[in-house]
A protein has these predicted regions:
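Non-transmembrane, aqueous-exposed alpha-helical and coiled segments at domain scale
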Residues: 1-411
Length: 411
């Protein structure tokens, strides 16, 4: 059976800590979408690990880690991540169906961002998915055969010829790209496998599989705050499509949310706090992007968005992250509805333009940092947790009270 860990905000919810906390109980940890635009940070024994492509199970020697077919892979960046770990043989597997991000994709991404101003990381994620959908991409499996790779490269060079000047690819682009693969393909080949068959077999044997999403539900290409979204499907449904596991294989869907809200880049954010309180949340929560180091926009918990995300994913339980960031705040707000042009909205709309937050205010608490038992939380903190559970209709099974793995309340 498989369990899914999915972010139910705009990403950066703390999925890495949760996966790291529970990965020891699983045989496989699988990253099922996105690219190295996503990042998750794990603090283990006081050491901070920033991962962008590697599944969070790499810190457990007995855990097998898979990068599945809907992930787009920068082989250069993945090789750099691999080099930071020892003995990944038979512990890391990359789907032969996963698509390869080319340097051209990053150039195209930067070119388009100048006019679109979406707030992308300009790492080539979107253009790589574009080529995938156009059926013209290079897949990881193509790196296993030099003849096939050369055929794919020739087709690529022909296709991008009209755009070389616009994307500033340079006169030596063809030579440089061949050299790029000559450098990195041999390093990555030992990890490329048919992971779809591997996971189907593991599921049939009853092995435990943890499916780890990147980014968050509200960035989903179809169901998120379009056009300010990522280029992949970020919901739990994508876990099946990417891995080859059928929906019957899914057992638990664990939705991850912070005790407040954050967003990176452009796009609507109804509960954003542009006052010094937003700065306080950013500073206390160390809200700076793992990948880009950009400061995250911060605000109050948005229950309209949270209920929507829980429904989309079929969440069976929640993990509430960074409760301690709210320590010492006298009045804590929660967005319980939107108001737009005099109309109250309690359902999440396809367009958040002109949506203003309707808040309910709660009394704060002094300290929750490092707490590991529910009864040790102050009454106001427990009331806040109970309110979220009641409104969303999903039980909170885990509460994080610091970045450390051990500072976790299990319910």
């Amino acid at each position: 059976m498989a369990d899914v860990v999915v972010g139910i905000q705009w990403g950066d919810e703390g999925k890495g800590k949760i996966v790291d906390r529970i990965a020891k109980d699983y045989d496989f940890v699988v990253r099922y979408q996105g690219g190295h635009n996503a990042g998750h940070t794990i603090v283990h024994k006081g050491v901070k690990h920033s991962l962008h492509l590697m599944p969070s199970g790499v810190l457990y020697p007995k855990c097998k880690n898979i990068i599945s077919s809907a992930v787009v892979v920068s082989v250069k960046d993945l090789c750099e991540e691999i080099s930071a770990f020892e003995d990944l043989e038979n512990r890391l597997f990359i789907s032969d169906r996963a698509h390869v991000i080319l340097p051209y994709h990053a150039k195209k991404d930067a070119f388009k961002e100048k006019s679109q101003n979406i707030g992308t990381t300009k790492k080539g994620i979107g253009p790589c998915y574009e080529d995938k959908m156009a059926r013209s991409g290079i897949r990881m499996g193509d790196l296993l055969d030099d003849t096939i790779l050369e055929e794919k490269l020739k087709a690529h060079f022909k296709a991008i010829e009209p755009f070389k000047e616009a994307y500033d690819l340079g006169e030596d682009y063809e030579k440089d790209l061949r050299g790029y693969f000559k450098t990195y393909a041999p390093k990555i080949r030992p990890f490329i496998k048919d992971t779809t068959s591997m996971l189907i077999e593991a599921n049939q044997k009853g092995e435990k599989i943890l499916l780890e999403g990147a980014q968050g539900t509200l960035l989903d290409i179809d169901l998120g705050t379009y056009p300010f979204v990522t280029s992949s499907n970020t919901t739990s449904a994508s876990a099946c499509v990417s891995t080859g596991l059928n929906p019957k294989a899914i057992n638990e869907v664990i939705g991850i949310t912070k005790a407040y809200s954050t967003r990176v880049g452009n796009g609507p954010f109804p509960s954003e706090d542009a006052t010094p309180m937003g700065d306080h949340l950013r500073t206390n929560g160390a809200e700076f992007g793992t990948t880009t180091k950009r400061p995250r926009r911060c605000g109050w918990l948005d229950l309209v968005a949270l209920k929507y995300a829980c429904a989309l994913n079929g969440c069976t339980q929640l993990a509430l992250m960074k409760l301690d960031v709210l320590d010492g705040i006298d009045a804590i707000k929660v967005c319980v509805a939107y108001e737009r042009k005099g109309e109250r909205l309690e359902a999440f709309p396809s367009d958040l333009k002109d949506c203003m937050p309707v808040y309910q205010t709660f009394k704060g608490w002094e300290k929750s940092v490092g707490v590991r038992k529910l009864d040790d939380l102050e009454p106001n903190a427990r009331e806040y947790i109970r309110f979220i559970e009641k409104e969303v209709g999903v039980k909170i099974r885990l509460i994080s009270t610091s970045p450390e793995r051990e500072d976790t309340i299990f319910l």
